[in-house]
């Protein structure tokens, strides 16, 4: 138990680095494996390998010593995420790639890194997802879905449904295929101790909260993925696996070149994603635009909808 300076006495989880009583500690909030808020007493000062405490690792999703699947290593974001995971001490990083006939210099550079293993993975192909899940699904501790298709324009500016169908096929149905094949086996391993499956990360968009007409069909596909991810979270929580949704603002990539700053670099997004894993949170909104939109959405969703349509 810990007695706060304000007077009340609390029952808390005690970090292994805390000095014997009587001693001062810092009390912080974390989520346990069921998603419930708990309090943890930490040492006043940082101690070596503080994040390696066994009890704390049960409450967070630190990739250190863990095996991670990144579903798309061809994108700049995917490559930045892979490098961030390696720097954080991931034991093994599987990197998915689709369309092998398309060359990617960034992917070749990743393959040369010691912890990286490339795996063919096409989220539009149920057979590809099923085969990859059969080969490595039982060993994945953290799944990070970075695969997405992003096209600009709304409804009236584009004829046909081909582009919107492709966005939905990757951004929504791709997530569904992953969830159907990887979800059950990861959920069954959520209580395997230090070798347990621990987290599933979805790269969404702040546009999932409120449609941005200039990126209308992309926004719709991310809104669908958000709804599906909430179902996935409910199912994965039963096994103690945390679902983390990342809602970045505009990313500095080829599809946002006409947008003015501020934009989020792939490295900044990867850093925010890594921190979300290490902190064990469920939702994170990286970047100034995402933070501003989130505040406006909380204040008045209807007002935000109207303002974005101007």
What are these regions (language model features)?
Residues 74-75:
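Conserved glycine-rich cofactor-binding loop
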Residues 90-106:
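Conserved glycine-rich Rossmann-like NAD(P)H-binding loop of the short-chain dehydrogenase/reductase
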Residues 130, 148-165, 188, 192-194, ...:
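Conserved mid-core segment of classical short-chain dehydrogenase/reductases
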Residues 179, 221-222:
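Active-site helix of classical SDR
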Residues 205:
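Residue(s) in the substrate-gating loop at a strand-loop-helix junction
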Residues 210-216:
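Active-site loop immediately N-terminal to the catalytic Tyr-X3-Lys motif
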Residues 245, 253, 257-297:
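C-terminal helical subdomain
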């Amino acid at each position: 138990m810990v007695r706060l300076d304000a007077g009340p006495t609390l029952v808390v989880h005690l970090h292994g680095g805390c000095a014997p009583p009587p001693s001062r500690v810092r009390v912080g909030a974390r989520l346990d494996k069921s998603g419930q808020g708990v309090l943890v007493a930490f040492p006043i000062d940082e101690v070596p390998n503080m994040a390696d405490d066994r009890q704390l690792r049960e409450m967070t999703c630190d990739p250190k010593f863990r095996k991670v699947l990144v579903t798309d290593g061809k994108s700049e974001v995917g490559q930045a995420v892979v490098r961030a995971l390696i720097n954080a001490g991931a034991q093994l990083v599987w990197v998915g790639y689709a369309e092998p006939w398309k060359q990617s210099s960034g992917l070749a550079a990743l393959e040369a890194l010691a912890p990286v293993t490339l795996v063919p993975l096409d989220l539009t192909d149920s057979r590809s997802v099923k085969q990859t899940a059969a080969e490595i699904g039982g060993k994945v501790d953290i799944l990070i879905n970075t695969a997405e298709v992003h096209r600009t324009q709304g409804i009236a500016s584009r004829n046909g449904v081909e582009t919107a169908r492709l966005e939905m096929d990757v951004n929504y149905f791709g997530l569904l295929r992953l969830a159907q094949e990887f979800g059950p086996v990861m959920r069954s391993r959520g209580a395997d101790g230090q070798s347990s499956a621990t987290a599933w990360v979805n790269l969404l968009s702040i546009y999932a909260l409120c449609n941005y007409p200039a990126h209308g069909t992309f926004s719709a596909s991310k809104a669908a993925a958000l709804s599906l991810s909430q179902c996935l979270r409910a199912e994965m929580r039963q096994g103690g696996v945390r679902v983390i949704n990342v809602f970045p603002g505009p990313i500095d990539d080829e599809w946002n070149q006409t947008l003015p700053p501020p934009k989020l670099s792939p490295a900044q997004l990867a850093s925010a994603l890594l921190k979300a894993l290490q902190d064990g949170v469920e939702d994170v909104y990286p970047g100034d635009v995402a933070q501003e939109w989130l505040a406006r959405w909380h204040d008045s969703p209807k007002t935000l909808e109207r303002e974005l349509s101007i």
